Amino acid sequence: MSREKKLSALGKSMGKQMIRSWEAPQFSLFSVVNCKNLIRYRNLLPVKMSYTTILVKTLADTLAEYPILNSSWDDGSKIIEHEEVNMGIAVDTKRGLLVPVIREAEKKSLEEIHEAMTGIKEKSWNGSFNMEELSGGTFILSNLGMLNISAFTAIVNAPNAAILSVGKMKDEPLVQDGEIVVGKTMTLCLNMDHRVIDGAAGAKFLTALVQRLEEIGR
């Protein structure tokens, strides 16, 4: 037996926003991260932090060097490169998908981002974010690794120019010093609005991000 489920105001708003976002010509780039140094770096931190926290910090630092990825499409008249990296974090809540924003993430230390992520986690249980906390994002990070997803693409949230999707860490065969060893890897997918970002710019950014993650703590 079927039953109707009326959309909430939030659901209606999200539906309209997804249609608007899907109208943008989007493309994807994938890259795999060798997580050996990332795991070691996290284990050596004096305070236990999530991988998402470390990703936010590394991503914000990389976006500051590649501002075209931290841009917005302004309805065909201009492209806006944002000075601040206002990082949206896609989270699952009782109210559905919400994207709280860490403002000026590029200026924050790892400890400050950890504090912000702790606050987001606490509010995610019941979705008790206010509109100010959910607005003004310039780039979104979506991590489904904890839900056992290996890799996925995400829709760029208009007017943003890009979104990064992160899959789970998994064991894979790797070539090291001419030998095959088992190592931890994770797949990153960068989805972009092709009106703002071309393939070369996206590739340079994603390569720089992967390099930062693989060399972290050195």
Model-derived segments and their meaning:
Residues M1-R218:
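C-terminal catalytic/motor cores of large multi-domain enzyme assemblies
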